[in-house]
């Protein structure tokens, strides 16, 4: 990720820890004042303040304590991509992809996608090689 190594290391450290509470501190320390987090699938956008409040209160408000399992982070220049899975307490490994945009050494925007596992349709069997689905 170019000269953003310190930022990349901190993001990776927090994500590997899997603690959503740590994400509030990460947003506080390593995001721009005008940071936004967008979830295109549900049509939601959060400001920096809302991201921190939600991360801090997630277990109380949602009734679950999600666990993030880090897979990898790739990037270069001012863009990075994070891949992992999230277990919201029901054992379902929700696939996660986050695209981060960096400005002045801090995260300015995160666009995040969440996908539940699904069975592959039978008609694709002749075209694909089977692999293990994501696990938490």
Regions found by a protein language model. Name each.
Residues 1-34:
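Short acidic-aromatic low-complexity motifs
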Residues 3, 53-136:
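A beta-strand edge to alpha-helix "cap/lid" segment located at domain peripheries
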Residues 8-15, 31, 51, 55-59, ...:
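Hydrophobic alpha-helical core bundles mediating ligand binding, dimerization, or RNAP-core interactions
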Residues 21-76:
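A solvent-exposed, acidic/Ser-Thr-rich amphipathic alpha-helical stretch
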């Amino acid at each position: 990720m170019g000269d953003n190594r310190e930022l990349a290391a901190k993001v990776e450290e927090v994500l590997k820890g899997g603690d959503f509470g740590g994400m509030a501190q990460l947003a506080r320390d390593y995001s721009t004042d005008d940071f936004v987090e967008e979830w295109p699938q549900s049509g939601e956008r959060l400001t920096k303040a809302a991201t921190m409040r939600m991360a801090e209160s997630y277990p109380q408000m949602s009734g679950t304590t999600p666990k993030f399992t880090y897979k990898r982070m790739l990037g270069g220049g001012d863009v990075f991509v994070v891949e992992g899975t999230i277990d919201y307490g029901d054992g379902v490994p929700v696939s996660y992809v986050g695209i981060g945009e960096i400005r002045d050494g801090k995260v300015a925007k995160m666009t995040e996608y969440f996908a539940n596992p699904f069975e592959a349709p039978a008609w694709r069997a002749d075209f694909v090689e089977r692999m293990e689905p994501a696990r938490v």
